[in-house]
């Protein structure tokens, strides 16, 4: 069978199973199987595929037709131009989340430049020649695969990233992604800010199959981290970024099969109104932000006004800004911890 005919049959089977983007997925699966890219595929579509390739290809098509996400079959997802490992233990990084990373990175880069300039102006020419811009401490809360924290560490110079998640399995994947992308990140395990309070650092080499009672398997145990600081002093950050669970519980049943049946419910369910995690984060984040520190949150398409009110009602943050995606829908909210008057 010619490669062109093989892929066309794969596309037909995926379309029949209700898979969106069946054409793209049929090609991606062939490229994954054979190790070629789509340019090479295009140039060689008239070549004959051997029987072994046909059988292996249709097994992948069968798996995708059962609505297993493409990324769970290939084991990877591109995000911000970097490759990330994914598994059923983490939410697959979405293109929409790149807006959060882009806005956070822009703020860090601009802040670094303005802070360095202000210090140079204050201290004179000699200081300008030999001083370094400040290092920023960033917390990636509910880090999942680590896509946000790893991307920020790749894009921004002189930042120190801490990433936390309640799932040890997710942290194991995030640790692999940090190593894969050659960035240093400190991983801590716990429920939102409880991870920062306890200072329990997660070994990023921990076994992805580890259970919830400890590192388990071949993974290593938790050990005290620098987050404990001295005495009872709390670690504070220049920026907290988070893409927490924000889907209404009643909406989960109508999600695509790939999402509701194959991605971790822990990363999806935001409670009855989808705002449970935001309430907790907004209520506590000011205790972990430095004066003037930034809070960036990814939000649902219709949650902007609810988040704006929630933030303003605390009286602890600046007037929040709602950032929209290309379709004009709510996507990110950002605000700053108020500085003392």
Label the model's feature ranges.
Residues 43-45, 55-113, 117-157, 164-176, ...:
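SAM-dependent Rossmann-like transferase core, predominantly class I methyltransferases
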Residues 155-160, 164-216, 223-224, 233-339:
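S-adenosylmethionine
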């Amino acid at each position: 069978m010619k490669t062109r005919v093989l892929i066309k049959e794969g596309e037909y089977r995926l379309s029949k199973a209700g898979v969106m983007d069946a054409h793209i997925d049929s090609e991606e699966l062939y490229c994954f199987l054979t190790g070629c890219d789509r340019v090479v595929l295009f140039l060689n579509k008239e070549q004959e595929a051997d029987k072994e390739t046909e059988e292996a290809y249709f097994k992948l098509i069968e798996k995708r037709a059962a609505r297993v996400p493409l990324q769970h079959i290939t084991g990877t997802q591109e995000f911000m131009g970097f490759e990330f490992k994914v598994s059923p233990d983490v939410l697959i990084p979405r293109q929409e989340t790149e807006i959060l990373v882009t806005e956070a990175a822009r703020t860090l880069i601009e802040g670094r430049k303005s802070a360095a300039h202000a210090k140079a102006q204050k201290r004179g020419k000699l200081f300008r020649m030999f001083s370094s811009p400040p290092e920023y401490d960033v917390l990636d809360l509910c880090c999942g695969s680590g896509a946000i924290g790893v991307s920020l560490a790749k894009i921004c110079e002189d930042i120190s990233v801490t990433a936390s998640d309640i799932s040890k399995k997710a942290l194991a994947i995030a640790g692999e992604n940090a190593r894969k992308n050659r960035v240093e990140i400190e991983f801590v395990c716990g429920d939102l800010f409880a991870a920062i309070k306890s200072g329990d650092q997660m070994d990023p080499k921990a076994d992805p199959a580890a259970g919830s009672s400890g590192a388990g398997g071949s993974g290593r145990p938790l050990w005290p981290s620098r987050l404990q600081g001295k005495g009872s002093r709390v670690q504070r950050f220049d920026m907290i970024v988070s893409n927490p669970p924000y889907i209404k519980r009643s909406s989960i049943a109508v999600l695509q099969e790939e999402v509701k049946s194959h991605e971790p419910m822990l990363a999806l369910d935001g409670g009855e109104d989808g705002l449970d995690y935001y309430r907790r984060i907004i209520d506590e984040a000011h205790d972990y932000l430095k004066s003037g520190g930034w809070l960036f949150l990814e939000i649902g398409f219709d949650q902007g006004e609810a988040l704006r009110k929630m933030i303003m009602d605390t009286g602890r943050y600046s007037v929040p800004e709602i950032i929209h995606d290309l379709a004009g829908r709510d996507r990110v909210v950002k605000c700053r911890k108020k500085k003392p008057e």
